[in-house]
Design a protein with these regions (language model features):
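Boundary at the C-terminal end of the N-terminal hydrophobic targeting segment
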Residues: 19-24
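Flavin (FAD/FMN)-binding glycine-rich loop and adjacent Rossmann-like elements that form
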Residues: 155-168, 172-475
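Terminal recognition/anchoring or ligand-binding modules at protein termini
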Residues: 504-558, 565-566, 570-653
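Positively charged n-region of N-terminal signal peptides that target proteins for export
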Residues: 1-5
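Conserved N-terminal/central alpha/beta ligand/cofactor-binding core
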Residues: 46, 52-53, 58-142, 146, ...
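Bacterial N-terminal signal peptides
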Residues: 7-17
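N-terminal Rossmann-fold NAD(P) dinucleotide-binding loop
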Residues: 40
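Beta1/beta-strand and adjacent pyrophosphate-binding region of the FAD-binding site
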Residues: 26-37
C-alpha cells in the first residue's frame, strides 16, 4: 500500500511540474510559450519558479533571441536598474567574465558579451527549472482555443507534428505571429497624432517600421582575411559610415565618427566585434511583419548580403582586412547569427495602450497607468530609419529624450482574446514608445511579467485578465523586480520595497528628468515632505482630503487641527513641510478611520518601523523625509496590498 501511494505521488508530481503526454501525440502543460527569445526565456523561468509546467517552442537551437541568436551582445539601458531576471543575467555575465567592469569593452554599452556566452547562460537558467520543457528547432503552426484550453500544433525537427494542450498561451515570437494567428487586432508602423495624441507623431499614419540589422560578429585573425568582392557591392552604399575620404555627403553629418571608433563601438570580451552600425552601415529596411515565410526568407537573404557587403567595405576600403566573421561564435554554415535583429513588430490592441505621453508625464494622464507598472526602462526613444527611402520625411526620432519610465501590465493583454498573453516587442505600445520599450532589459522584464501573470492565473484557475494587478506586481517585486523606475533608491536600499510600493499607489510621486543620456525618475527619499507632496493620499483615502487641506493652510498659529471621529489629528501642523509629529498623527488617524488598528497601536507599529529602518521619530518637530514617510505609510496602512487597482490604474472601490 505504501509503495502504491508513493507511485501515485510521483505521478501526481510529474503532472503538476512537467509537460506530459496525455495521449499519443498530445502533451499537456499549464503554459505554452511560443518563442525562446529575450522575453520567452524569462517568461519560462518565472512561470516555472511559481510552480507552473511550461513548454517553450523555439525555432532555433539557441535561447535569448535578439541578445544571442540575433547577435546583439550589447545591452541598452537599465544599467542602474538591474530588475529581476535581467539583473540575474547581468550577474551571470559578470561571473563568467570576472566582474562587471570586464563587460565594459565597447562604448555603445556597459554590458558587452559574446552571444554564445549569453546563450549558454540562458540554457543554464532554463535547465535549473524542472518545470520547463524546451522544444528547439520547432515552430507553432496552428492554435485553437475552445474557451478553456488552448490546442497548439507544433512542427518538430524530425518532420512530425506534436499537439500540446495548455491553459495559457504566451506569444514571445519576434514578430507577434501567434497574436495574428489568434485573431488579435494589431498595428504596424507609425500611428497618427490623432490616434495617440503624441505631439511628435506624424499627421498621417503609415506602415513604415524601423530598420532591422543582420548583425555580424567579427574577430581579428591577425592576417589578411579580405573576402571576395560580394555580388552587388557598391562602395557608395557605405561611404559615409565613418570619417573617411570616400564620404562626401553624409546623411547625418553630426554623427560622423573616426573609423576606429566605429569598430570599437561594439567591441566584445574575447576580442570580438559586434557589427551593428546604424550610421550608413548594416541597418537594412524590410517590413517583414506580414510577409509570407518565403518572402521573409528572401528578405533575410538580402539583409545578410547587405551586411556582408559592409564587412567587405570595412576590409577593402577602411583597411580592417584582418577582421572577418568569427569561426567560433555561431554554428551556422555562413557564420552569421540565426536571425536578424528586429527593432519593431506587430503591436497589439491591448487593454491599454502605452504612449510617449505616459512616459513623459505619467501622473498627468487620464489613465494612471503608472500604478500598474511591471517593467521599467531608461533608454531614450531610439528609432532607426536611415535605410528607408524617404526617411527625411519621417519624424526625427533619434534619441528623443524621455525620463525613465514604467510599462503597464495591461499592455500585455489583448482586448478580446482570452488566456493569451503577449510579450516581446508586440505589446500594446505606440510606435514611438516602442523606440524605448523594445530594448533588451525592458523586454526581459516583459517576459518575466508574462510568466508571472500566466502562472498566477493557472494556480488560481482564473483568466489572465482576472488576476490582481497587485498580485503580479508583488511577485515581481519579491523576485527582485522594479515597479517604479527610481534612480535614487537602489535595489539594495533598505527602503527599496516600501518606496516601490508607495510609489505605485501615487501617494508619493517621482520626478522625471532627462539630462543628456541620463534618463531618470527621482523619488528623493532624503528630501523633506511638503504638504503638496502627499496630495495623492486623498486619491487613495478620499476622506483624508480635509486633513491635507488643513495642512496646506496651516500657519504658525497654534491649532488643534481637524478631527477624525472626534480626535485631533495634530496639536500644531507644520508650515510647508510635514514634521514627524504631523506624519505620525496623519498615519494613525487614517489607520483608525480605515479600521486597521487603533491609533495607539499604530503609534507602536511606527516606533517599531523607525527602529527597523534606522530613523528616529522621537523629535516630533523634525521634518520628516519622503523615504521615512513611505516606510510608515507602507508599514501601517498597507495601501499597495489593500487598495486594489484595475488594469487602467484606477482604484477598485
Amino acid at each position: 500500500m505504501r509503495k502504491t501511494f508513493s507511485c501515485i505521488i510521483i505521478l501526481l508530481a510529474s503532472f503538476l511540474c512537467f509537460a506530459h503526454r496525455a495521449t499519443a501525440g498530445i502533451f499537456r502543460s499549464d503554459i505554452v510559450i511560443a518563442g525562446g527569445g529575450t522575453s520567452g526565456v524569462t517568461a519560462a523561468v518565472q512561470a516555472a519558479r511559481l510552480g507552473a509546467s511550461v513548454v517553450v517552442v523555439e525555432q532555433t537551437t539557441w535561447l535569448g533571441g535578439m541578445l544571442t541568436a540575433a547577435g546583439v551582445g550589447a545591452v541598452d539601458g537599465n544599467y542602474n536598474m538591474p530588475a529581476g531576471l535581467w539583473g540575474e543575467f547581468r550577474d551571470s555575465l559578470a561571473a563568467h567574465y570576472g566582474s562587471l567592469e570586464a563587460l565594459k569593452t565597447g562604448w555603445v554599452s556597459n554590458v558587452m558579451f559574446e552571444p554564445s556566452v549569453g546563450n549558454r547562460i540562458f540554457h543554464n537558467m532554463v535547465a535549473k527549472e524542472k518545470g520547463v520543457t524546451l522544444w528547439t528547432e520547432s515552430e507553432v503552426k496552428a492554435v485553437n482555443h475552445n474557451g478553456n484550453v488552448w490546442t497548439i500544433h507544433v512542427a518538430r525537427p524530425d518532420g512530425h507534428t506534436d499537439t500540446v494542450e495548455a491553459k495559457v498561451l504566451i506569444d514571445a515570437t519576434e514578430l507577434g505571429d501567434i497574436a495574428k494567428m489568434c485573431g488579435v487586432p494589431y498595428d504596424v508602423g507609425m500611428e497618427s497624432q490623432a490616434a495617440t495624441h503624441e505631439d511628435i507623431a506624424p499627421a498621417q499614419a503609415n506602415n513604415i517600421v524601423q530598420d532591422l540589422t543582420y548583425v555580424a560578429i567579427l574577430k581579428d585573425y591577425g592576417r589578411d582575411m579580405t573576402m571576395e568582392k560580394p555580388e552587388g557591392y557598391n562602395a557608395n552604399d557605405f561611404a559615409c559610415c565613418c570619417i573617411n575620404d570616400k564620404c562626401i555627403t553624409p546623411k547625418e553629418p553630426n554623427r560622423q565618427w573616426p573609423k576606429d571608433k566605429m569598430v570599437t563601438y561594439g567591441k566584445m570580451p574575447g576580442g570580438k566585434y559586434m557589427i551593428n552600425w546604424p550610421i550608413e552601415g548594416n541597418d537594412f529596411y524590410a517590413n517583414m511583419v506580414d510577409m509570407t515565410p518565403e518572402q521573409r526568407n528572401e528578405a533575410v537573404r538580402k539583409a545578410k548580403a547587405h551586411t556582408m557587403r559592409f564587412v567587405y567595405f570595412m576590409q577593402h576600403e577602411l583597411g580592417f582586412n584582418t577582421l572577418a566573421l568569427a569561426d567560433d561564435e555561431y554554428p551556422t554554415a555562413d557564420r552569421l547569427p540565426f536571425m536578424p535583429y528586429h527593432r519593431e513588430s506587430r503591436r497589439i490592441h491591448g487593454k491599454v495602450r502605452f504612449t510617449l505621453n505616459h512616459m513623459t508625464d505619467p501622473y498627468g494622464q487620464a489613465q494612471p497607468l503608472y500604478r500598474t507598472n511591471i517593467a521599467v526602462g531608461d533608454y531614450p526613444v531610439d528609432h532607426h530609419h536611415t535605410r528607408y527611402t524617404g526617411e527625411e520625411q519621417l519624424p526625427d526620432l533619434h534619441f528623443h529624450p524621455v525620463p525613465s519610465f514604467g510599462l503597464p501590465l495591461g499592455s500585455l493583454l489583448p482586448q478580446e482574446v482570452k488566456q493569451l498573453v503577449v510579450a516581446e516587442k508586440s505589446v500594446s505600445v505606440s510606435n514611438i514608445a516602442n523606440g524605448s520599450t523594445r530594448l533588451q532589459p525592458v523586454v526581459m522584464q516583459i517576459g518575466q511579467a508574462a510568466g508571472a501573470l500566466a502562472a498566477i492565473a493557472v494556480k488560481q484557475n482564473k483568466g489572465v485578465d482576472e488576476v490582481s494587478v497587485r498580485e503580479v506586481q508583488n511577485v515581481l517585486l519579491e523576485a527582485g523586480g522594479y515597479l517604479m523606475p527610481y534612480a535614487d533608491v537602489p535595489k539594495d536600499s533598505i527602503c527599496f520595497k516600501p518606496c516601490q510600493r508607495i510609489g505605485a499607489t501615487g501617494i508619493l510621486k517621482g520626478r522625471g528628468v532627462s539630462i543628456d543620456w541620463h534618463n531618470k525618475t527621482l523619488f528623493r527619499p532624503d528630501t523633506v515632505v511638503a504638504w503638496n507632496d502627499i496630495a495623492g493620499l486623498a486619491e487613495v483615502y478620499p476622506f483624508a482630503a480635509k486633513l491635507l487641506r488643513h495642512g496646506e493652510e496651516a500657519s504658525s498659529v497654534e491649532t488643534n487641527g481637524p478631527s477624525v471621529d472626534g480626535q485631533s489629528v495634530g496639536e500644531a501642523l507644520s508650515v510647508d513641510a510635514l514634521s514627524v509629529g504631523d506624519a505620525l498623527s496623519l498615519v494613525s488617524a487614517i489607520a483608525k478611520q480605515e479600521k486597521l488598528m487603533k491609533r495607539s497601536a499604530a503609534m507602536k507599529v511606527m516606533a517599531s518601523l523607525a527602529k527597523e529602518y534606522d530613523f528616529c521619530i522621537d523629535d516630533r518637530q523634525r521634518k520628516i523625509k519622503r523615504g521615512e514617510l513611505a516606510v510608515l505609510i507602507d508599514g501601517v496602512l498597507h495601501p499597495f496590498e489593500k487598495k486594489q487597482v484595475d488594469v487602467e490604474g484606477r482604484f477598485v472601490r
